[in-house]
A protein has these predicted regions:
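Generic alpha-helix detector with strongest preference for long hydrophobic helices that associate
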Residues: 1, 5, 73-77, 113-117, ...
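Extreme N-terminal leader/anchor segments
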Residues: 1-74
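Short charge-dense sequence patches
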Residues: 37-45, 54-64, 79-91, 112-113, ...
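Acidic-enriched, low-complexity/disordered segments with a strong bias for Aspartate over Glutamate
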Residues: 38-39, 58, 66, 75, ...
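Aromatic-lined, polymer-binding surfaces characteristic
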Residues: 81-173
Length: 173
């Protein structure tokens, strides 16, 4: 009986800790913590041949102008889990033709940042988050090159913020 009571207490204790953690991750305190940025500038120019061994790329390239993208982030809650992950991981950037509009691509990312700049459990899931960081940085010709200064500031901030969250979660595991 004592062993059973102890196991029940332990289970309840861990459930309470998980709930407290969820509240903390969604709090302004955590948002401020992962928003702390040092002034070091990171310059990254990805090499596609290195990425080829990590990422299965679709040989067929698409033009971003061929897609309807007006309210993609607001409509994403209606997607099934697999499509939701694909959309928010941004791995679809690898299928875009580099001649696609940089302005449209940057506008899509800017809209995503406006909708999701704070932690959201399903969107900031480690698998989705790590793929998103890889996709955004690796496709810098579309996501960053020739962008306006305000966009670059917003982009750099969210990359660093997501990276800080990723580091926190890796340290925790």
């Amino acid at each position: 009986f004592i062993k059973s009571a102890f196991l029940n207490f332990g289970s309840i204790f861990f459930q309470i800790l998980n709930q407290i953690r969820k509240i903390y991750l969604n709090s302004p305190i955590y948002n401020k913590k992962i928003s702390k940025i040092d002034d070091k500038v990171i310059i990254y120019k990805p090499n596609q041949s290195i990425l080829n061994c990590l990422i299965k790329l679709d040989k067929k390239k698409y033009n971003i102008e061929d897609f309807s993208l007006n309210s993609v982030w607001k409509d994403s809650t209606n997607l099934n889990k697999k499509s939701f992950k694909k959309l928010h991981s941004f791995f679809w950037l690898f299928t875009l033709d580099l001649k696609s509009s940089k302005k449209i691509t940057q506008n899509i990312i800017s809209n995503w940042i406006d909708e999701n700049d704070k932690y959201k459990q399903y969107i900031w899931d480690l698998d989705i988050l790590s793929k998103r960081i890889i996709a955004w940085i690796s496709n810098s010709k579309l996501t960053y090159e020739n962008a306006e200064a305000n966009y670059k500031i917003k982009f750099n901030l969210i990359i660093k913020k997501q990276t800080n969250h990723l580091i926190n979660e890796i340290r925790r595991s």
